[in-house]
Amino acid sequence: MLPLLEEETRLEQLCGLEAMAQIAASLKPFHPDRVVAYARSEVTISNDTVTAEGAAFRSHRRWYGLTFTCDLTDDRQAVRSFAFSVGKAIPKRLWEQYSLPDPMLDTD
């Protein structure tokens, strides 16, 4: 499915999947089920690097701040390296402002 998306969206999704996998593997209390790379600020893509300074991820029906740098292979089909930092829980009153779906209403 990822090859059918626009290039920028595909790269964000590829890095978002990597973020969920790495968070789940290294931070056992979290079980991420969604990432919004552009939640609190625009994503930047430069050459083969995707940087999301204002991303968010959802775990256990709560949203948390996330920043990541995702370096892609030369063909941009896979992740070469990935670094991330998890932030604080995002208050529910800010979810709509950041386009973060309420887990109770999310149909995706």
Regions found by a protein language model. Give the residues of each.
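Mitochondrial intermembrane space
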Residues: M1-D108
